[in-house]
């Protein structure tokens, strides 16, 4: 099978689509609010959900494998924080900013914080 395409659904979740056939391979609903950003590592997809009203018990940035099964959730600098932006820094590292003014470099293989800087 070719590398899958990932899209945000009209209901705010994620779907995986076979680019050759257009067939939907898998779907995953949002886990707290709605999906607002998708980032593509070598396989699978990294998802960021809207932070506003996201349940603070868990991270709003997470990695789904090619079948849209959750593999990890990004570590947060504090238990109450949420990610407001995410982008590729390079070499498998995400750079994410949080609501509580942290900039975090996150390992895309594990979701662990590699470095964090207070930026307020």
Stretches with model-predicted labels:
Residues 45-46, 59, 66:
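Long, charged/polar, surface-exposed segments that mediate recognition or autoinhibition
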Residues 1-9, 15, 41-55, 89-98:
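Short beta-strand elements that form the blades of beta-propeller/WD-repeat-like
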Residues 59-62, 102:
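A short loop-to-beta-strand structural motif that recurs across blades of beta-propeller domains
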Residues 77-120:
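Short, compact, well-ordered microdomains
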Residues 2-4, 29-43, 48, 76-89, ...:
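Repeated scaffold domains used in trafficking and secretory/extracellular systems
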Residues 18, 39-40, 107:
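Acidic/polar residues at beta-strand termini and the immediately following turn/coil
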Residues 12-32, 63, 67-78, 114-118:
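Aromatic (tryptophan-biased) beta-strands that constitute blades/sheets of beta-rich domains
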